[in-house]
Amino acid sequence: MKPNLYICHTAYQVLVDLLRASRTDGQPHIMVLSAAVPEPQSLAKKLEATGAVKVVIVDETRWPGTVTGPFAARRARRAFEKLCGWRFTRAAYNEVRIHNDWSVLGRYLQDCHAGYILCEDTFASTLGPDQHLVTDQRAAPDFAGKQRTGKGYLYWGDSPWCAKVE
């Protein structure tokens, strides 16, 4: 069985995904830690000692922004891989889970047409009564075109490359 891929930006997400990984066949799974997680090297050693995951640390701050123009998704993918030092291969994983699809890693997954699962904490907090991000995104004039073609980025589960929202 293929391992799952878990992408984490916070200690809470690491805890949730470590619990998932330890209860799911296919171990060791792969956990990508954003360098935004406090003390990622130290944490990576502790996580790997559990046997549930192998850890890859990705420093998203190396990616300066977006790419536009012809073949933008392909060019953005290649630039991310070169600058951040990690390459995603969809066929290597069973499930791909991310908590923040509006992050650099989330945009990279969209560029890779990843078919990811958006985990619960970000989506639920975005839909609170005073949150306008999702409704504003859906009201944008180019929303339907982005959903139909997959060109450009959509967040909070609206991307056609998001397979499911938990």
Segments predicted by a language model, with ranges:
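Catalytic cores of histone-lysine modification enzymes
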Residues: K2
